[in-house]
Amino acid sequence: SPVQKEIDFKNIKNIDCFVCHDVSGKYRKNGANGGMPADGVDMKLVSASIGRPSKTNCGACHFYSGGGPNIKHGDLEPQLANSNSGLDIHMGMANMRCQDCHKTSSHQIAGRSFMAPVTEGRVDCETCHGETPHGITGVLSKHLDDHVRTVSCETCHIPSFAKETPTRLSVDFSQAGQDRTPKMDVNGMPDYDKRWGAITWGKNVVPVYKWYNGTRKSYILGDSMASTDNVDLNTPIGEKHIPGSRIYPFKVHTAMQPYDTEKNVLLPVKFRDGYWKDFNWDTAIKEGVKASGMEYSGKYGFVKTQMYSSIHHEVVPAVKALGCADCHKVEAISCRRCHKKAEGMDQPIHTQMVYPDVKNRIDFKALGYEDDPAFIGGRFYLQLGRGKPPK
């Protein structure tokens, strides 16, 4: 927007200290006015109420990104500010602050969203828990630690997200602009908004699992689309044969959004004081294109896009983490398949699903396996030259 163009992000005087350091809870910003303090804020009170950032400070932006509570990320909902251990073990039982993980030096905050264009100062579970977090006791400890080389901690320890506040899963802009009454879904969320179009929501959402090596391929405004069937806006890069790749959980958000049918590129749209003013796509696209410096053929359509958001918050207690049978076939879970003298090692708990209502959680074929790797061999066997596991 024109206001954003005028902001010099390198000028330290443009940093709003109160957003992070106000502890009165009374500070508010005016998003429509370049982020200036909202009218009516008692600046004397706020100026006298300065302290370390709390979860509420961080959440003032991150809990509401996307235009409302938990809309964008899915694993950052307002309840985390006063969490219980069932919602998030770190912020709940341990009462950790955001900066306990997102270490900060000279106001440089480690860790960024998967949707951000760059990542500086990666935040990893291993920083605190190490590479062998399951201990040396217990029959399964070594096997669980073996999984860490292939499966991210979040995959097992965040079985679902958006546990209390629904998150948006899709939006169809092609249906926007209609005067129709929205219906409420099972979570009490509207299935339509004139500004956005048709909307779907999810609660207790099971993630999508993808290989990821810490890099991604992002669509840059102006890039020509290879296909108009399904456009990935930020694809996680990784594969079972690529070193450093591990299986991570993701939220996937899909949309039907405008694109130039002649140039085959996605189109920027001016919404505020643009489309939302008269609901004319052509005019709003022309204004968006002009502001971005792109060219527009004058012909537009709608294309399906999908955006990935990595899941890192809402970690459950260890007893609620995924069990063997939540991912693998029950018939593959037997110690004696490999340990021939493992009398008494097989326990009923090994084949019990912690989340029996979730079927086919892991799509092994989508991850590049012909079948369950517990049967045909995964990294545990193939990389160590063991061949295929016994049947």
How should these model regions be labeled?
Residues 161-391:
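Long, charged, low-complexity terminal extensions
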